[in-house]
Regions:
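General detector of folded, globular domains
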Residues: 18, 32, 40-41, 57, ...
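Alpha-helix-loop-beta-strand connector modules within alpha/beta enzyme cores
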Residues: 54-77, 109-128, 156-178
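Catalytic cores of alpha/beta
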Residues: 76, 80-93, 136-141, 160-193
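A general structural detector for well-ordered alpha-helical segments in enzyme core domains, enriched
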Residues: 32, 59-66, 85, 106-113, ...
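Glycine-rich beta-to-alpha transition loops that act as phosphate-gripper elements at the mouths
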Residues: 19-22, 72-84, 103, 126-132, ...
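Flexible "arm" and connector segments at domain edges
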Residues: 135-144, 182-193, 198-263
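Conserved N-terminal beta1-alpha1 strand-loop-helix module at the mouth
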Residues: 3-74, 81-84, 124, 130-149
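Glycine-rich phosphate-binding active-site loops on the catalytic face of alpha/beta enzymes
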Residues: 49, 92-109, 149-155, 188-206
């Protein structure tokens, strides 16, 4: 599995689920992370920008536990004031650290972070409604050492298109998908992923299939064999062996119908 920059910067577009961990029970955050991991999310963005140290330490502990439970990469968003804060965040196993523009530390701290971990480990989140940035303004952060930008509260205007197509930064769009369309956001050549909480109670694979039908390449497990080609058991089902995907341990024999096979 690709967990670093190779995972994100592959040609395929991604759907990343975000989880707001502020004022949330850690066990609930962990359960939701596991649910997304099982149900088709390509990655997670888990954040808690609370400023007090006790809350940060509890969040970091929770993030380390989540990293051991899930099989998809995750980004971490946390309050960072100095290099040590960033180091603790990335040592949770997170593939990227996301810092809000309003909470950006001093430039010297950013340079120390990127000197140690690389430009690809650091992202800045910008509210495009409150503080629109064009390509040149985005590139200032790239030149500072930040490789990725997360753009939220966006409108799909010509100005937005020019900004994302013109910047040197890797572009991720964070959106609730209430006004904007998933396929449209992913159709921008420079948009590498959409970060959303829209699929907390919805079928991610169904959305991926719809996006793929529109010609957008996105990770999707698809069988090359049609259900009709299988020799069925007397009950009209396909016999299957169920294994633990981590250990390959055989758990049981089961039967699958066409609806389950096509999911």
């Amino acid at each position: 599995m690709l967990w670093g920059k190779e995972w994100l910067y592959m040609a395929q577009k991604k759907i990343i689920a975000f989880i707001n961990a502020e004022n949330e029970v850690p066990a609930n955050v962990g359960c939701l992370a596991l649910k997304y991991s099982y149900e088709g999310a390509d990655g997670l963005f888990i954040y808690n920008y609370t400023g007090d140290e006790k809350s940060r330490e509890e969040f970091l502990l929770s993030a380390r536990k989540i990293e051991k439970q899930i099989d998809i990469p995750f980004f971490i968003g946390i309050y960072v004031n100095r290099f040590e804060d960033a180091k603790k965040a990335l040592y949770t196993g997170a593939s990227k650290l996301v810092i809000r523009k309003a909470l950006l530390p001093e430039e010297d701290e950013i340079k120390e972070i990127t000197a140690r971990f690389g430009k690809d480990k650091l992202a800045i989140e910008i509210d495009m409604k409150a503080d629109f940035h064009n390509a040149a303004q985005l590139d200032q952060y790239y030149n500072m050492g930040i490789g990725t930008v997360v753009l939220k509260h966006i409108d799909t205007t010509e100005a937005f298109r020019e900004a994302v197509l013109g910047t040197k930064m890797h572009v991720l769009v964070r959106d609730g998908l209430i006004r904007n369309d998933l396929a449209e956001l992913l159709s921008y050549e420079s948009t590498e992923a959409v970060i959303t909480n829209y699929f907390e109670d919805k079928d991610i694979y169904k959305a991926k299939r719809a996006v793929k039908r529109q010609g957008i390449d996105i990770p999707l497990f698809e069988s090359l064999i049609d259900f009709s080609e299988f020799k069925l058991a007397d009950n009209g089902l396909v016999p299957v062996i169920v294994q633990d995907y981590r250990t390959s341990e055989v758990l049981m024999m089961a039967y699958m119908n066409e609806e389950s096979y096509n999911k």
